[in-house]
Amino acid sequence: MIKNTPKRIQFTGGANKVTERALLNGLSDKNNFRNKIGGGIISRGGQARHHTATDLAQEIYNLFQYIDKGGNKKLYAQRADGSVHLATDSPPATTTGNFGAEALAAIADTKAASASILDGNLLYSDGKRGHYAYPGASQLVKGFHVYKGTAAIPVIPEIGEDYTNEVTDSSTSRVAVLNSLNTLANYNFFLVITELPANSITLTMVNANGTAATLAGQYWKSDGAWASMSGLTDGTALAGATLGQSGAIAWTHPSDEIPHYQFGRSGYCYRFNVSAAIDSTVSVSQAVYTGAWNALVNVWDGTPAPAIEAQVYRVNNLKYEKYGGSSINISDLFDGSGDYVHFTTFDNICGFYIDTGNTPNIIKATITGSSDISFVDGGTGDDYITWQQARFQSEGFEEGQSIVITNTTSNNITVKAKQVTSNKIYVNSGLLTAEVNKSATLTYDNTGGTFTLEVWTGAGWTAISTNLSDDTATASKSGWVTFPRPTTAQMTQFNGSPAFAYCFRFKFNKTTSRNAVISIMTMPFFDITDWGNGYCNGTWRGRPILAQDKYPQWIEIGTSYRMNCFNGLDSKPFEVGDDGRDNRVLAFVNFFQDLMVFQEEKGLEGGCITLIQGYDTQTIEKSIISNSLGIVNSKAYAVVDGVPTPKNPKASHAKMVFFISREGVHMTDGQGVMRISDPMGLYFDTTDTASCIRRGYEDKHWLNYDKLHKSIRIGLCTGTSATVANVWLVYHIDTGTWGTDTLGQAITCMANVESASGNLPVLQYGGASDGFIYRLNTGTNDVGAVPIAVNAYVTVEIDGEGHKIDARTLQLRCKAQSAGSITPSLAFNGNTTYQDETVRSMTVVTANDTYRVNDFPINRKLTDHISIKLSHNTAGEEVYLLDMALLDAEGKNVFKN
């Protein structure tokens, strides 16, 4: 209150739009002013267009800056039509012409978007399409492998040299070795794996190639095969020699690209091969990539998932044998019959791994003795073959095999094994002639087999044959079976299985061996569009966090430092809130080591604020900060350090989250919530329809932290007809007080951006309803089509509190300046008409004066209440008010300490 202040009245208090002026003893209005750290208040800086023209005069929904791995600063603006545009010039530079090129196409009915950054990748969500991701430039690759084979390259290679660490560090002495890399026809290539889709890979060469050769590239296509890149340009070529210099290999983004699994990694795979063998000393020290904006995909984490169960059907006994996925008996499956191996999986798959362990399907066994194989005529009993090395079983011979015998005198025949031990093979009586210590050759050959793979599609079984690859040679060795994604697969509870799952089956065209037992692991794939449109996103503890509109109260916590992996044990779906209400998640806020989640407010119960804690997906838990308050949209919050609190007004370390709800402006410390907007309560008073925030326009409000002035700036869409923000508030954090702004251009969103030049590291920019982006806190005018003066005024209410005020003179002190004036005016006893208006200079009287004093007469002897309004509304000028005093007829201060 005024009477308890020092003799001079300070202006650092706050405006009050709720209390009747006659009841106030302090400020009622404080418009377009900012508190100064050293005392006093100064008119806010102006705002100026970042670009000179706009191709579409529509509202800017949101504004955000993205800094990629290469340090490139990119300012993006989201327009009302849903498109996203990239600034041609980074702040503070201005652009002649339009703001910048379109980065993401328009789509109707988007909300104010959310954007976050994880490991240099941008994540974007606007509520009307899937989440989008963008790697920017100079993003590190996730895999770099060199393959030099001697036979046909399998779909999932098992050999190769991994140079990922060498090309992703800063050392030039650690390199990827491409020495004498040969052609693809000779089974040579190098492979690059990226987390997000790439359209350019830049290689830094240490030892360059000088041999004439060209480069070709392939990507993994949705049909389950490699496809040639379109529009490939080789920036590493020098004088006809690829890899002859450092440079970028670029190509056109294919629309049919999907992730792939190579060398134990799952991601986007790019295979490169040369047309001729290159030099014997060629090496690469770094590989980085660039990509474009692409829809986010849920990429498999690379950990094979076990099959749920298997059922083996045998025609000879007309029944199914049930097994767990880790031990499946496929012995004696007959060729050409209806013997099938069925297996189920919770997720659709594009491949499965058959692990044969020590019990493969034996398709070939051969030995040649060294004068140590003998043939025994068993008389009336079984004949048999003996081998002194006693390795028949370990070499793959077993009962039931047809064995071809050669290199003998009398036994060059084909026999069928009845029983096999380590040193004997028994056959039917009368087949063998006695021979001793021969160097005979015994061969069992069942090679050349294939198997048929089918998938359940709802109406029946559908064969998968195109691009089917079997690296197991019909389960004779461990390996992958891969195929294109079966888009028509349907789930079923196969043959009474308790699991509703996808079902696949395969059969062999040759009889399997007697003791074949396998396990099956699967290669799943996922469709992120099953979750609906991407509504908002965030990051937490190095993980991407997603919210969708299909399951609004559920969030997806992704794999650690994987931008696009939301499956496997290191990821987790998690329900926020406390009671299952389907309120949409609108904002994620990192708060210390925790994650604060805001949901929308709707119905009688309102919204919810959840605090998620934990070190990983296994230790995660939640607590409820509020089960009634929520947030209006994803651009209506700010996290601020060093906030004074009522319990500790001098605190310099308190962290607070400021946010707008339909109930007002609040701040939370993660434990409780405090409403701070009471002095501006008319904007949240539903009985005041002319001033209250407008229902149905919640997405138009905004809140952000002004790092220059250490204040919270707010835009509200109020009244009955406004369609964009039309009221702007300022919360002065240091004093916990309020002010208002009147803006020459309707700012609809705000962002702090890192400056590309100049002495100020952080600048403030805002998007406006006219389609322009404005720099804030700059100059003295609001410069749009024409300059508009910053109309700054402060109104001080002085109440006698039951006493008459005997004030004859208003003494005002201003910071001295080279030009400018201040206009005081007075109103008495609650009258809203100001009078005694006069204009006084703020320029210096005497050289080196630091402030200017002006005395204004008060033409009223005694009064109950005085309203003093100090105004400045001149283009090209600012006003800096220090303090004021009221003097009586004797020149003494009316207010005593």
Mark where each language-model region is:
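Exposed low-complexity, polar/acidic, P/S/T/G-rich flexible segments that act as propeptides
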Residues: 139-151, 274-308, 445, 508-533, ...
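N-terminal beta-propeller domains
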Residues: 1-97, 131, 139, 162-165, ...
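A short beta-strand element within beta-rich, extracytoplasmic domains
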Residues: 195-209, 217, 347-368, 447, ...
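Hydrophobic or amphipathic alpha-helical targeting/insertion segments
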Residues: 112-138
